[in-house]
Amino acid sequence: MDWNWRILFLVVATTGAHSQVQLVQSWAEVRKSGASVKVSCSFSGFTITSYGIHWVQQSPGQGLEWMGWINPGNGSPSYAKKFQGRFTMTRDMSTTTAYTDLSSLTSEDMAVYYYAR
């Protein structure tokens, strides 16, 4: 029997306590093993050139694992070794949105993905 893994991506936005900051994440995503997924987080109330944009993964029953961040000054991403090669972070200054693309999905990618500043 051929099993197709379906991978759930749920992006949750987190930030420090600040009443003016708003974050809107993309909906949960379901993808087959081997596919790719792009998730997003739109934000307002702060400038993306003043704060780093971090992505964090939490697999079922596991702790938080830092995936990488986008440098606020030059927009360059930096990745944790585990995620290098399959994971791409970008930001769109015009829409104040951060994106992450994850390719060649496996069952190990089933997790909740957090955005943090």
Swiss-Prot record:
Gene3D superfamilies the UniProt entry points to = Immunoglobulins (2.60.40.10)
A GO BP entry: immunoglobulin mediated immune response
Q: Where is the stretch described as Complementarity-determining-3?
A: 116-117
Segment Framework-1: which positions? 20-44
Q: Which domain of life is it from?
A: Eukaryota
Q: Which Pfam families does UniProt cross-reference here?
A: V-set
Annotated stretches, region: Framework-3 = 78-115
Signal peptide limits: 1-19
Instruction: Give the span(s) annotated as Complementarity-determining-1.
Output: 45-52
Q: What is this protein called?
A: Probable non-functional immunoglobulin heavy variable 1-38-4
Q: Which gene encodes it?
A: IGHV1-38-4
